[in-house]
Amino acid sequence: MQFSTTPTLEGQSIVEYCGVVTGEAILGANIFRDFFAGIRDIVGGRSGAYEKELRKAREIALQELGEQAKALGADAVVGIDIDYETVGKDGSMLMVSVSGTAVKTRR
């Protein structure tokens, strides 16, 4: 399965549009992990623990997107958009959502 944020794939023709596909992943905030991340893990203004969790959530969302596309018979997803949003009481969770168009391609 190929993924692209662009509307086309270099060297390939889109022969069929299969539909819009989506994927989501929600990260819950853990107060103790958050506290220790703030003390131990911030180096140069970045938190490795948070970055690792965000990467994992993005991978889960993209995996869901790919599974939906495959179920539609697609071999690629184009025009992918990745969004991050806080949800829950007091923004206590982070949602990663991805969407795109499932397509069939030909070289």
UniProtKB/Swiss-Prot annotation:
Superkingdom classification of source: Bacteria
Cross-referenced InterPro entries: UPF0145_dom_sf, UPF0145_YbjQ-like
Coiled coil: none
Pfam families linked: YbjQ_1
Gene3D superfamilies the record matches: Hypothetical protein apc22750. Chain B
Family in the record: Belongs to the UPF0145 family.
The protein's name: UPF0145 protein YbjQ
Species name: Salmonella dublin (strain CT_02021853)
